[in-house]
Amino acid sequence: DIVGYLQNFTLDETIGGQVYRVTRPQNSGKGTLRGAEFGIQKFFDFLPGPWSGFGAQFNYTWIDGDNESKTGFDSDEFTTTALVGVARQNYNVALLYEGNGITGRLAATRRGDYVEQIAEPPFDQDRVVKATTFVDLSIGYELNPRVSLQFDAINLTRAKFQSSLGPYQPRDIRYNPTTYGVSLRFKM
C-alpha cells in the first residue's frame, strides 16, 4: 500500500487577476502497488578459449498499481489514477563479454507506456509517454592493471521520445541522437 505518493500536479490558476499554468508537487492519497521481477545472468564459461567470456543477461519487471490524485490544488476530493512515472512492463536484454582485459556490453532496454502527468490542462487528459526501446554499447579495455580505456555509445537506434494527451493526441516528439563517449581511467 502507498500513502502520500509525491507527484507533480498542473492546473491553470489565477494570481493577481492573471491566469498562469502552475506545476507543483503535492502528496496524493492512498494507492496500491504490486508487481513481479525476474532476472537471469549467465556466462558461457563452458565454451572453449575466448568464447568462454561471453554471457547474456535478461530481466523483466511487471508492475500494476493505482493512486488517488487530488482533483485540484486546494481540493480534498480524490480520483483514482495511474501511478505517475510507472510503466507496467520493462525489460532489459544484454550480450556481455569479459576476458583478456576486454569488457563489453550490448544492451536493449525497453520501458513501456507510462503516465507522465495526470489531467494536464487545458484538455484535462493524462499525458502518456509512449513505450521506447534504447540500444546501448559499452566496450572497455584494460591497458595495464592501473589504466583502462572505455568507449560508450548510447541510443544506437536513435529511439525517439513520444508523448500524447490521452491515448491518441500527439503532444511531444523528440528525436534523440546517438551519444558517444570515451574515457581513460587511472587507478592510484
Residue spans for each PLM region:
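C-terminal beta-signal and adjacent terminal beta-strands/loops
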Residues: D1-V3, F54, R110-A119, G140-M188
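A surface-exposed, glycine/aromatic-enriched loop/edge motif typical of exported proteins
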Residues: G4-T10
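Active-site-proximal flexible loops/turns
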Residues: N8, E68, A159-Q162
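Gram-negative outer-membrane beta-barrel transporters
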Residues: I15-I118, T157
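Short coil/loop residues immediately preceding or within conserved phosphate-binding loops
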Residues: T23, F134, T179
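Short, contiguous acidic/charged loop-to-helix segments that flank catalytic cores in large enzymes
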Residues: S28-G29, T79-L83, F123-V129, P170-R171
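Short solvent-exposed loop/turn micro-motifs enriched in small/polar/acidic residues
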Residues: R88, K130-T132
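Outer membrane beta-barrel transmembrane domains
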Residues: T133-D136, Q150
